[in-house]
Amino acid sequence: MTVIMLSPSNGWAISLDKVAQAIQPGKTKYLVINEPYNPAGTLMSQQTQQELIALAKKHSIIIMSDEVYRLLEHDSNDRLPAMADVYCQGISCVTMSKPWGGCGITIGWLAFPDVSLKQKLIDVQYFGTACPSRASELQAMMVLRASDHILDKNLTIVRHNKTLLKQFMHTYADLFSWTEPTAGAVAFIKFKGPMTSEQLGEQLAMQNISIKPAYCFSDEVTDETDCFRVGFGEEKMPKALAALGAFVEHHKENWRLAMRERRRRKSKL
């Protein structure tokens, strides 16, 4: 398996050149993507999606597209077509947990136009579970009957909380940076201060503030090591953001002093 790491340096964009280089003709069978991208909440363009499909089609590669944050685009005009709708060997993976907020239902589904894949996927399912919970199926049906109402409500929360998060990022632009998310309810924020995201997470945990440091997503040391994920899809997020802001206010001058000292040392090298 070849993993292609995305980078904040280009806004977490998929490099088609790297994908092409990773393909081993005749050996590569699947391309697995995460779109919208978790943890950064970014989206590829429709042109990139079409070029990716053309590349996969050239080598007869199945694209498995994790679309669990689809339908939570902050602007509906940015929404990409489901992979299953635009590629003959595309598979779209969806769950109840993200756009509908049905985390406890533990129900999801795969959509694909190639019926020859059906039995293969059913066989794979049996490695994890013999059958889904009937109670979860009934709950999922109830939620989906009210889908439009639930999505509208959740998007209202997401958009409001994102506005607050943007204000936070503007206020502390010298301490934090990001690629502004355009879909989903998560953002991947870079901490510019004098510690790793893991160390920051440990300090925040002592104040009952939870973030997801970079090591939760990769054990490799990359240019995202200082990044951490935050969620902004819940009604209680403004309270959590206020607590984070109070923590930053308490420490910001010491951080800035350490950052100036670090820059001074680098300038002497």
What do these predicted ranges mean?
Residues 141, 157-166, 177-190:
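Conserved glycine-rich beta-strand-loop-beta hairpin in the small C-terminal domain of fold type I
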Residues 206-207, 219-269:
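PLP-dependent enzyme catalytic core of the Aspartate aminotransferase-like
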Residues 176-177, 189-229, 234:
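Conserved C-terminal alpha-helix-loop-beta "cap" of PLP-dependent enzymes
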Residues 6-78:
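Active-site phosphate-binding strand-loop segment of PLP-dependent enzymes
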Residues 58-59, 172, 207, 251:
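Helix C-cap/helix->beta junction micro-motif
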